[in-house]
Structure formats: structure tokens, C-alpha cells
Amino acid sequence: MYENSVEIMSGDSFQIAVFETLFLLVSILAAALLLGGRVRWIWLVPIPVVAFLGKLILFFGAHGTLGNWIGGNYNWEGKIYSTAFTLTLIILLFGRDLKQVGLTLSQKGIAPRLGIAITSVTLIATIVWNALYFPGVKSEPIIDMLYQGSMPSLDEELWFRGLLLAMLVKGFTTNGVIRKDHYGIFLAAVVVTFQFWAAHSITTNGDWGFIFRTWYNPVAGIYGALWITIRLATGSLILPIILHTVANIVGYFV
């Protein structure tokens, strides 16, 4: 989603990272209970650790720990290192079958036509919503426009609807076989969607006070639900990445 350039204090950042990780942990445990505990913990246990490390990398970049060799008002360095971290894990865990994380140009998921139809509607709705809700063309330096047109969509799609979804599906399905009612995959999609919303809504009062700003960015939850539906329907991250990018940059044009 679109990112602002407001700097967050390092203490607040660490607290937010902890809160987001705990939120994810609780979501995973709740889903495991709904599945009667018939899950593969070997895939689920590492997820909160990976999520926490990825968030720390992101915040290190925001505070200049990773350098400031690109410039601009946004966290290029944190996003680049975070993306590299996610890609490394994808290669290590799913390198033999990248389709499991949606890294394929092929649009041959469980319902590709439905996915493409939802993509078309979502694209139009995104443009119309931005034109009505954020009237006037926004202007920023080219380096910032390039950031919004690349890093958030790549980093977040590779993590949320790529690696995280794939690990959850592995954990929520037994022996690598999808349940006949697809319940495990549905729960994985729900966890990813709520976590995506949480990542854009969780904050702190600065003294370990948990705050979930339910109506601060509800569109993140809506986008998250639509994009993961498209990801599952097409079997690919391509269209979610494109839609995510459009959502971030459409304000520069309409």
C-alpha cells in the first residue's frame, strides 16, 4: 500500500514489530485450533520469526542503519533488503517449485477467468475511488514516484501473498495434499488478509500500548481480500503486483 514519509521513532518501531508479530502468531494459533490441531507445525513455527526479522530489516532501513545511498523521502534501503530477505527464503524453501509462491507468468490457477474478471473490476474501482477520494493530481520527486511504483508492491506481495501464503498453506494442509473442502487454504488466505490489514493499522502509544486503528486504513483490508482472491484464482503474483502498483501510483495521474 501507499506509504507516507513520516519517520517513526526507533522505540515505537520495535514495539510495532513485536505487536504485528504477536498478531500473526495469534491468528495462526486460532486457525490451527479451527483445524483441530491437524497442522504441520514445522511450517508454522518459523513464520512469526521470519515476519519479525523482516520487519526489523524494514525498520533498520527507515532509521538509516542500512545507509541512505538512494535518497528520496522513502525507505528504499529497508525495502530492498527486506525484499532480498524474502526472495532468499523463497529460493531456499520453494526453489524447486516457485509456482507455490506464485512466481510464474502462467495464469492457470483454480479459476483464472474469475481472477482476471476481479482484476478488471478492481482496477476500475481503484482508479475511480482514488479520483473521488483523493481529488487532484499529486506531485512528488521522480525518485519518490519510482519508489511508490516499485518497492511496496514487490516487497509486500512477495511476502504476504507469496512466501507467507505458501508457508501457511503448507502448514494448514496435511501431507502436502489440499483438503477436499479447501478449508486449509481458505484459513491461510484469511490469516494473510488480516495480517496485511494489521500491518497498515497497528501502532503503539510509545509505552507498549497496543493500538489497532480499525478505520485508519480499512481499504488495506479490502485490497488485501481482493488481491489474495486474484492470487489464488490465477495461481500467480503478477496481477496482484500490478494492482498493488496501480493503487500506489494512480494518484500521480488522476
Residue spans for each PLM region:
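Residue-level recognition of transmembrane alpha-helices
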Residues: 115-116, 244
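Alpha-helical membrane-spanning segments of integral membrane proteins, especially the hydrophobic core
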Residues: 111-115, 148
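Membrane-interface helix-boundary motifs at transmembrane edges
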Residues: 32-45, 98-109, 173-182
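N-terminal capping/interface segment
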Residues: 84-108, 116-124
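Transmembrane helix-loop-helix hairpins at the membrane interface
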Residues: 5-9, 13-28, 124-254
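Hydrophobic alpha-helical transmembrane segments of polytopic
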Residues: 47-51, 118-119, 192
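Intrinsically disordered, low-complexity regions enriched in Ser/Pro/Gly/Gln/His and often acidic
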Residues: 34-36, 122, 220
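N-terminal, membrane-interfacial amphipathic/helix-forming hydrophobic leader that caps
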Residues: 1-97, 249-254
